[in-house]
Structures are given as C-alpha cells and as structure tokens.
Amino acid sequence: MFATAIVAVLLAAASSAFPHAAREASKDDANVSVQLSAVGNTMVKAVVTNRGDEAISVLRLNSVLDSFPCRRVDVYKEGKKMEFEGLLAHHDMQNLPDDVFATLNPGDFAENTFDIAETVDLSAGGPVTVLSEGVFLLARSDSTSISGMVQYRSNELKIDVDGVLAAKVESAGGLRRRNLDKRTSFYLDTCTPAAMKNLTALLKSTTDYADAGARAATNGSLATFETFFKKTDLRTRRPVASRFRAISNETSIIDGGIVRLTCSDDFCKGTINAIADSWISFITICPRFFSAYPPTSPECHATDQTSILLHEMTHMRHVYSPGTNDFAYGYDNVTKLPADQAINNADTFAIYAAGKFFFFWFFVPYPIASSIPGLIYFHRFLPWMLNGKVIGTCRRCMPTSLLRRHLGGKSL
C-alpha cells in the first residue's frame, strides 16, 4: 500500500521532472558570428562578433577563442574531415575567473590567431577547408556563471597548404607526448600512492556508471533518454549503449587496457581538471581533480571525480569511435543541444550515466535499492515524511527504468 502510494506520487510528478520542453539550441542563432581568415601558411585568425543588442560574455575555453590546443576548428581535405590530434581539457565550470571570458558589447568583437597545424597533420600539403562550428557558452556581462549558450557556424575558409612548412610546426600534442614518453611508461607511474589508490577505486565506480548508462540506454525510460539525446530510435540508443559498454570494458581492466593515465602534465593549469589526448589514448588527471571534487556526489547532476573520468573516457576514439567533443557542460546546457551534437558531447554521457547510477534513500546505494520493491526515487530532492519527520532523502536522479518496471513497462 505504501509502495503504491509512492508510485502514484512519483507518476504525477514525473511529467514535470523529465520535460520534453527543454529547448534545443538552434543552429540558426545569429547573435554571435565567427569569421575565419588566413594570415599565414597554416595560421588562422578567428574574429567573434556580438551581433545582438545586449552585452554578453563569451567563454573562451574549448572554443575558437582558446589559446589551448583544443578543437577550435575542423579541417577537411577532399571532403573528408581530418583527424584531430590536439587535446581536450575538462574545466571547472563553477569557479571561472574573469579572464576566461570575452565581454562583448553590441557590435564588439574578440579575436584569436592560432596555427591549425598544432592540432592537425598537414605535412602532406594541398588544399584544405577550415570550418568552426559549435557552441559558445555565455555568461551575463556582470557574471562568470554560465547562464546560456549560442550556436554558431563560421565561414568556410579555403587554404592551399605548403606541406613542407606545415611539417616544421611543432604540434602541442607532439611536444607533450615526447615529454610524457620520457616520464611515463606504464599505468599511473607518475601518480602518488594516494592518487593511485584513489584512481584505482574510481575506475571501478566509472565501470559502474558506464554499466548503468548502458542499461538505461537499452531498456530505460524513453522520456529521459530523449531529454538528453533528443531521439529515441534504435539508431540513437544502440550507439549510446555501445559507447557505455566499451567504456565499461576498458575501465574494468584497470591496468591492462588501451587507455593510460598520468598525474603529471605541464598543461595542468588554471581551471583544468583533466586532459584527454585521444590520439594516443592518454588521460591526464590534474592535481585540482583530487581537491575540487568528491569521488562521487549525492547531488543531482553534480560533477564528481567519477563522472569526470567517464567524461574523459568518452573522448577516447580507440575505446569507441568517434571520440566525443566538448560542446557543452552541465545539465542545463547539454539538454539544449540538438541531436547531432548531443550524441557526440562528452558531458551528455557523463551526466546521463551518473544520474542512472547513484542516489540515496536511507543512504542505500542504487545497486542495492534497485532490487527492493517500492524503493523508487525522484529527479530532485524528495524528502519522505512519516509522522512529521524526514526519514530519508533521494539525492540523485531517479532511475526511471526502475519506475518504468514498477509501472508495468509504461514510459513516463
């Protein structure tokens, strides 16, 4: 009887907990424009202009305005996208300093000049097309808290590359790899004993998160899946589940898999928590990763060490191809991505899987609670009241597949 009442309450609330109305970011947004121009053999200048009528602050990180050798542009040769050989950095999005934003009044612009040979092998030379397309994360002009996002697509820049000159460009990834090869020859050899112990445990919890994500993508709530990935057909669900299973297979091996982990890197600066080098299947765990986040978090949609490691694993193209990109961070932003970006966005996978795995009721973890009929949980904080006293709190996203099972297989 008590369990039946719980299900009734949750069913009534669930329609608002997993809204279909989370607005996707339109690719036709015109408030921000990006213009690319060639300023040397492989040097490109990007000019970002505020075309709107209000001041905005554009996040430079993981964008065409970033000085870090991230995926600022895509390069195409003979109609085929060339392999990205740069780095992807995971940033702390909750404690961003002022200098990682470009504040633009209406009509103002910011620019960045970079060498595309840093992140793409152009030694063969010849004609290529350069394009930047993606998302700018935005803050209000008086804040450093992310409050929205805007889609953009640049012009297509044609360049005839001199391969001999391009081959002389030292790629940031290549320089980093040589330094790592001097120091790192096996799993976690640059980590302290405490960090090694922590990461070994985190690989186990990452396996659990990935397993939960795979189960949910295969048999879970269609409504929840659609909130994150925008489509619910098998052509969408199967690759999502397959990526999770591939990650689970990798992280369960611990020290015998494809991916190598290190705790030492000269790029670990500022807000960077971790760095993914998909080209050589290398993940760097930066010092702030251990100090800024708990191993797991009971807060709904919160970032924790396990979700960061899962996020980084989705970038690894040798684990599951293609590796993901970093279009957006955080629940509010990833759920606004269109379908083609959502299925290739690392944080979409991380948040979806984390929400499917870990929550509390009477401080009982999901693997135990999911086997007990009647222990069904909700998307946000939900105190259960008995005789005026709080007897438990759900603090992680509701496992909707469990609710669906108790509702006789009906989708929310």
UniProtKB/Swiss-Prot annotation:
Signal peptide positions are: 1-17
Give the location in the cell. Answer: Secreted
Indicate the residues removed as propeptide on maturation.
Answer: 18-183
List all disulphide bridges recorded for this chain: 191-263, 268-286
Cofactor(s) annotated in UniProt: Zn(2+)
Give Gene Ontology CC terms. extracellular region
Q: Which residues form the active site?
A: 312
| Protein's UniProt keywords contain Secreted | yes
**EC number(s) of the enzyme?**
3.4.24.39
PANTHER family, per this entry? NEUTRAL PROTEASE 2 (PTHR37016:SF7), PTHR37016
UniProt name for this protein:
Neutral protease 2 homolog MEP4
Whichever gene encodes this chain, its name is: MEP4
